[in-house]
Amino acid sequence: RSCEICHNFGADCESRAEECDSPEDQCGTVLLEVSQAPISFRTIHKNCFSSSLCKLERFDINIGHDSFMRGRIHCCDEEKCEGLQFPGLPLSLPNGYYCPGILGLFTVDSSEHEAICRGTETKCINIAGFRKERYPADIAYNIKGCVSSCPELSLSNRTHEEHRNDLIKVECTDASKIIPSE
């Protein structure tokens, strides 16, 4: 199988077709949006993916302090695989739970704050790793926050970029209940 491969800021990118390695049997498009108020940016990634990563379909992480990270994964059997657009953000109220919150880029050791969970968010996610780019050093990242359900991610998930994206931690736990102050 061959798929379009490209990465860019925004909603589109110039792609080239490349052969995929097993077990990456599907073409896919990943849209990412990262917002740390008042700054927000989106990126697009077209690539070869394993069917296990395609099953993830979407993720939404509430990092707290009006910050979030969300992604949409759309896979198909054709070389050209257009992604789905982001819907508007849902309006949801705090639900009495909290998690550690971090959006750490360029470091795996970031200072934590409390992320107040909203709506159906009752789980805490903790993801850390390194992204290898054509820079003098790897880009480290550490993301913690509230999620509605635990994604089926593990350290063994392979993508076409296995040599460029190194997950070192994937944890999902129950959120803590806020104890009302007297």
From Swiss-Prot:
Disulphide bond pairs: 3-27, 6-13, 20-48, 54-75, 76-81, 99-124, 117-146, 150-172
Post-translational modification, as annotated: N-glycosylation is not important for activity, since deglycosylation does not change its PLA2 inhibitory activity.
Carbohydrate attachment residues: 157
Expressed in which tissues: Expressed by the liver.
Keywords: Disulfide bond, Glycoprotein, Phospholipase A2 inhibitor, Secreted
Highest rank taxon of the organism: Eukaryota
GO CC annotation, single: extracellular region
Membrane-spanning residues: none
Protein location: Secreted
Gene3D superfamilies in UniProt: CD59 (2.10.60.10)
SUPFAM superfamilies cross-referenced by the UniProt entry: Snake toxin-like
Function: Strongly inhibits its own venom PLA2 and all other PLA2s tested including Elapid, Crotalid and Viperid venom PLA2s, as well as honeybee PLA2s.
Assembly and interaction partners: Heterotrimer of 2 subunits A and 1 subunit B.
Name of the protein described by the UniProt record: Phospholipase A2 inhibitor gamma subunit A
Native source organism of the sequence: Laticauda semifasciata
